[in-house]
UniProtKB/Swiss-Prot annotation:
GO process terms (BP): cytoplasmic translation
Originating species: Chromohalobacter salexigens (strain ATCC BAA-138 / DSM 3043 / CIP 106854 / NCIMB 13768 / 1H11)
SMART domains: Ribosomal_L2, Ribosomal_L2_C
Similarity remark: Belongs to the universal ribosomal protein uL2 family.
Renumbered residue ranges of the record's region Disordered: 28-58, 223-275
Entry keywords, A to Z: Ribonucleoprotein, Ribosomal protein, RNA-binding, rRNA-binding
Residue stretches of biased makeup (Basic residues): 254-275
Role summary: One of the primary rRNA binding proteins. Required for association of the 30S and 50S subunits to form the 70S ribosome, for tRNA binding and peptide bond formation. It has been suggested to have peptidyltransferase activity; this is somewhat controversial. Makes several contacts with the 16S rRNA in the 70S ribosome.
Lineage summary: Bacteria, Pseudomonadati, Pseudomonadota, Gammaproteobacteria, Oceanospirillales
Coiled coil: none
Name of protein: Large ribosomal subunit protein uL2
Subunit structure: Part of the 50S ribosomal subunit. Forms a bridge to the 30S subunit in the 70S ribosome.
InterPro entries (UniProt xref): NA-bd_OB-fold, Rib_uL2_dom2, Ribosomal_uL2, Ribosomal_uL2_bac/org-type, Ribosomal_uL2_C, Ribosomal_uL2_CS, Ribosomal_uL2_dom3, Ribosomal_uL2_RNA-bd_dom
Biased composition (Basic and acidic residues): 28-38
Gene Ontology MF terms: rRNA binding; structural constituent of ribosome; transferase activity
Length: 275
């Protein structure tokens, strides 16, 4: 995987930085694991915008990714690595000995032809999925479940990982990249290693149009709006907004804590590092 800066042959190419990978499959994705992906333009069933800055973009199919890794005791071979437009990480197509194929998040260092497996008896090897109870303390993991059997919810994006730092009783303690230390049920599964495509953070799209291809619409500043549209709007001439930065609904937007989940507070051993 290489990071390439394009030559400034035009204004749109001048600032482009691309991540080029020779190991990614160049053909069509596997048809048996594709689903239709319809666009909402950020609107709900009333036609009102509920998610801003969403709309347009290239047509895509959704790749059905196996986040549960529950096909135990059957070895699988990595058939190919693929680009996935729906996420920052690449995906790997596994072919099991019984003929079934599944997509998984591609771990860093996993190559075509590698053998992977999942389950309690799986080897301690990069790319294998095991319950946290069976993973050695100190290991780097990704694609971690929060509820047994629900599927991975933590550390799924490009370059993401967490570290298993302790295990006591029915719970394992995991240190996340944010610095948060959290207890997770030891029966929850995780995949050894870290997510691949860590160079994703180095890319630069280079022009506004590349953002539009990805379905992202422009963000208008509040101070450029009218008072009816935003708390920062209006005023004679250019203003600074006249108050601490807030969202269009008046909620403080820089550094204001918004977490409201008391149910799981007891599972957080240490909060994430203050930014």
């Amino acid at each position: 995987m290489a990071v390439v800066k394009t030559k400034p042959t035009s204004a749109g190419r001048r600032h482009v930085v691309k991540v080029v990978s020779d190991e990614l499959h160049k053909g069509r994705p596997y048809d048996g694991l594709l689903e239709k992906k319809s666009k909402s333009g950020g609107r709900n069933n009333n036609g009102r915008i509920t998610t801003r800055h969403v709309g347009g973009g290239h047509r895509q199919h959704y790749r059905v990714v196996d986040f549960k890794r529950n096909k135990d005791g059957i070895a699988a071979t990595v058939e190919r690595l693929e680009y996935d437009p729906n996420r920052s990480a690449n995906i790997a197509l596994l072919k099991y000995l019984d003929g079934e194929r599944r997509y998984i998040i591609a771990p860093r260092g996993v190559k075509v032809g590698d053998s992977l497996e999942s389950g309690v008896n799986a080897a301690i090897k990069r790319g294998n999925a095991l319950p946290l109870r069976n993973i050695p303390v100190g290991s780097t993991v990704h694609c971690i479940e929060l509820k047994p059997g629900k599927g991975a919810q933590i550390a799924r994006s490009a370059g993401a990982s967490a570290q298993l730092v302790a295990r006591e009783g029915n719970y394992a303690t995991v240190r996340l990249r944010s610095g948060e230390m959290r207890k997770i049920l030891a029966e929850c599964r995780a995949t050894l290693g870290e997510v691949g495509n860590s160079e994703h953070s180095l890319r630069q799209l280079g022009k506004a149009g590349a953002k539009r291809w990805r379905g992202v619409r422009p963000t208008v500043r509040g101070v450029a709006m009218n008072p009816v549209d935003h708390p920062h709007g209006g005023g004679e001439g250019r203003t600074s907004g006249g108050r601490h930065p807030v969202s269009p609904w008046g909620i403080p937007t820089k550094g204001h804590k918004t977490r409201k989940n008391k149910r799981t507070d007891k599972l957080i051993v240490r909060r994430r590092k203050a930014k």
